[in-house]
């Protein structure tokens, strides 16, 4: 009897071993979710300068360098005029993630060089509202001049689904101190159309004793196909009123959405004051291309 049990046990072991070889079992290996490859985005724009020539700007930015938690920032840019003069060139590096961000920007031309530091925080207040705070400081060194201008800016904005409000302060050391308050609202929107309205007030105090206020409002319309119009009116206390209109249109967009060509135009006219009837116009083209890199 014992021999029979032993023989049966051996037979069972051999059978199980044969099954294991015939049907091997593998533990599932977790596959990480796909990540977007890095993108090199190229932006180019040309705009008419009322003083002559065309203002040309180019920018090359790298995105999707990090992961869903942390995103590095890297870009280089240059701006100049077709009639010559100084060419502004610079670079920005930084990092953002978890609603926080910080960056530094270095710019240089033939006259001065600037170094800008910026930090921001975005606090979500539910599904459709957020509180955004920003601070920045720009230090400028002008060749041949001991005076070093410094511009400090800070802002706090509450942005909701259809309403928003903000307050900001810009201090240009030795020149001016500006406090701006604004309110914005979405008047109408659907799948194709969007209309926003905003009003603002700025109190400008200059170190030379000339103080004034700017108050104004604007209507901004945009279409889902990439077209838009805006119109605004600004009152400068003690100076006069100025009207502004502008528009933009997407002239071309590639089938893959990586390349687009946009045109913009704008104009302003003083309605009263010492600059009454003075007009300024601007026209521009902007080319953007996102080149995917594996």
From Swiss-Prot:
Pfam family, one: Attacin_C
Tissues in which the UniProt entry reports expression: Synthesized by the fat body and is eventually secreted into the hemolymph.
InterPro entries with a match to the protein in the record: Attacin_C, Attacin_N
Localization per Swiss-Prot or TrEMBL: Secreted
GO cellular component: extracellular region
Positions of the propeptide removed during maturation: 23-24
Modified residues (Arginine amide): 293
Keywords: Amidation, Antibiotic, Antimicrobial, Immunity, Innate immunity, Pyrrolidone carboxylic acid, Repeat, Secreted, Signal
BP-aspect Gene Ontology terms: defense response to bacterium; innate immune response
Note: Sarcotoxin II consists of at least four structurally related proteins named sarcotoxin IIa, II-1, II-2, and II-3.
Protein name: Sarcotoxin II-2
Organism of origin: Sarcophaga peregrina (Flesh fly)
């Amino acid at each position: 009897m014992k021999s029979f049990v032993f023989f049966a046990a051996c037979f069972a072991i051999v059978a199980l071993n044969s099954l294991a070889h015939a049907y091997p079992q593998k533990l599932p290996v977790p596959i990480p979710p796909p990540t977007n490859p890095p993108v090199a985005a190229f932006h180019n724009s040309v705009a008419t300068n009322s003083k002559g020539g065309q203002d040309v700007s180019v920018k090359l930015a790298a995105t999707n360098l990090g992961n869903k938690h942390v995103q590095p920032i890297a870009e280089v840019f240059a701006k100049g005029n077709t009639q010559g003069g100084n060419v502004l060139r610079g670079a920005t590096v930084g990092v953002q993630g978890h609603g926080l961000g910080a960056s530094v920007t270095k710019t240089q031309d033939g006259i001065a060089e600037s170094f800008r530091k910026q930090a921001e925080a975005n606090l979500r207040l539910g599904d459709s509202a957020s509180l955004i705070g920003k601070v920045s400081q720009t230090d400028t060194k002008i060749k041949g001049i001991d005076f070093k201008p410094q511009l400090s800016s800070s802002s706090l904005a509450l942005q909701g689904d259809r309403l928003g409000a903000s307050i900001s302060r810009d201090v240009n050391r030795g020149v001016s101190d500006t406090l701006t308050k604004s309110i914005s609202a979405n008047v109408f929107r659907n799948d194709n159309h969007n209309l926003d309205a905003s009003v603002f007030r700025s109190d400008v105090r200059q170190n030379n004793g000339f103080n004034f206020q700017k108050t104004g409002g604007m209507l901004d319309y945009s279409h889902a196909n990439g077209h838009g119009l805006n119109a605004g009116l600004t009152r400068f206390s003690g100076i006069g009123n100025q009207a502004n209109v502008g528009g933009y249109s997407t002239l071309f967009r590639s089938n893959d959405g990586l390349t687009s060509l946009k045109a913009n135009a704008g104009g302003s006219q003083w309605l009263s004051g010492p600059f009454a009837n003075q007009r300024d116009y601007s026209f521009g083209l902007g080319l953007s291309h996102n080149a995917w890199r594996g």
